[in-house]
Amino acid sequence: MTENIHKHRILILDFGSQYTQLVARRVRELGVYCELWAWDVTEAQIRDFNPSGIILSGGPESTTEENSPRAPQYVFEAGVPVFGVCYGMQTMAMQLGGHVEASNEREFGYAQVEVVNDSALVRGIEDALTADGKPLLDVWMSHGDKVTAIPSDFVTVASTESCPFAIMANEEKRFYGVQFHPEVTHTRQGMRMLERFVRDICQCEALWTPAKIIDDAVARIREQVGDDKVILGLSGGVDSSVTAMLLHRAIGKNLTCVFVDNGLLRLNEAEQVLDMFGDHFGLNIVHVPAEARFLSALAGENDPEAKRKIIGRVFVEVFDEEALKLEDVKWLAQGTIYPDVIESAASATGKAHVIKSHHNVGGLPKEMKMGLVEPLKELFKDEVRKIGLELGLPYDMLYRHPFPGPGLGVRVLGEVKKEYCDLLRRADAIFIEELRKADLYDKVSQAFTVFLPVRSVGVMGDGRKYDWVVSLRAVETIDFMTAHWAHLPYDFLGRVSNRIINEVNGISRVVYDISGKPPATIEWE
């Protein structure tokens, strides 16, 4: 019998902050399970979830507006600790009898708050001391409205010159509100405050660890599928690879992995996937060479969204054909992770906009003939990687830069042709190899090469050549929501450019993309 790793759990109500998933990841890093739900949950749903504590997230709305989101009243009647962050603090103050006003000046950026009263939330936590010995905390503010009067049964714990109620608390009811964001690294002691709330005030044990998550997942897979056979589309990406390893540990030879080689992968990637999972780890793998089929379906298509849909559709067709060849397969496994689940829920409720269609969930037929196994659907990407390490997958593979589901299909601009993919593969491999050699690979968040379908004049020896152009792209980002272009050294870029032009026959010019996000996206398509 495996330990119940969901026994202690935190409920995070999402009021729309860009940092809400970060709050959840921080709680998980503390070894405690949590879930992220939209703010408008019912009392019955909260009772059913039975949380050890509740966190109210930040959000972009103004609590002073008539129809702005509110926490369900039951949150304050459930008898568990509640932690309001930014907007979450404002709605808590307002709903419990305090007052919030729209501020003339928006407070955004670093601030130093002075702790004026003792509280379980910040006791013994400080960045510096005032002249008279009061603790100071360096925090990150991002708010327009501010609390101007706290509820009568609360005390002021900390304040700044412009924000009289930076932290408020009702110690008896274990209700706490902070006007800053403890989940971002700019709030230096933020993790300690979250730990104080989750571990001490809510009394949650650290049961959510990679080894225990694996034991739990294996037990749940065995319970769900029994002795049935399972099929998985293995791409070599992080999610499908960790899914494969978990299933292999749980059901061994009853798992069949289908590896569809679509001709849109990185250099030697197909061979590496087959070597590692087939030869090294001993998984059942069906290798389907399908390059010609994908390229034929993509012929003549220039639109990025249409290309994504075609690649998704052909993958499903090929995968379905292979599944039909296997006898008695009852289950389809997928590497769906928790952000996919959150994103799909947001799309269903109309609370988010689709910028690009999501490859993992986009095209699968609604009429599923098989049951669905999704062992990673409670996990964030960083948790999936830690589990992969625990299962024996190599670090370099798990911490590789992100690669889009449609692969080179969206890194070749416009129409996708075999010639373009072959050139791009080799150019990209040189760029990545040089980044690793210069110890720059782990210093950038993502780096890749893009094929531009334009020809440019070049000089080789005594002759002129009229060949293709590629662009190098490297970015630095924390969350991939915004990104800066990476300031790679000029001599490094020169070395990469020389190697590509000299070693990849067919490329005459290399450029470097210096666009940030926004306004540009990280991928070109």
Curated annotation (Swiss-Prot):
Example GO molecular function term? ATP binding
The segment(s) forming the Glutamine amidotransferase type-1 domain are 9-207
Q: Active site annotated at which positions?
A: 86, 181, 183
Instruction: Name the catalysed reactions.
Output: XMP + L-glutamine + ATP + H2O = GMP + L-glutamate + AMP + diphosphate + 2 H(+)
Residue positions annotated to bind ATP are: 235-241
Which EC numbers does the record give? 6.3.5.2
Presence of the UniProt keyword Cell cycle in the record: no
Q: Which UniProt keywords apply?
A: ATP-binding, Glutamine amidotransferase, GMP biosynthesis, Ligase, Nucleotide-binding, Purine biosynthesis
Query: Which Pfam families does the annotation name?
Result: GATase, GMP_synt_C, NAD_synthase
What GO cellular component entries does it have?
cytosol
Which stretches make up the GMPS ATP-PPase domain? 208-400
What pathway is this protein said to act in by its record?
Purine metabolism; GMP biosynthesis; GMP from XMP (L-Gln route): step 1/1
Give the highest taxon in the source lineage.
Answer: Bacteria
Q: How does this chain assemble? A: Homodimer.
The free-text function statement in the UniProt record for this protein reads: Catalyzes the synthesis of GMP from XMP.
NCBIfam families referenced in this protein's UniProt entry, alphabetically:
guaA_Cterm, guaA_Nterm, PRK00074.1
Tell me the protein's name. GMP synthase [glutamine-hydrolyzing]
Provenance organism: Escherichia coli O17:K52:H18 (strain UMN026 / ExPEC)
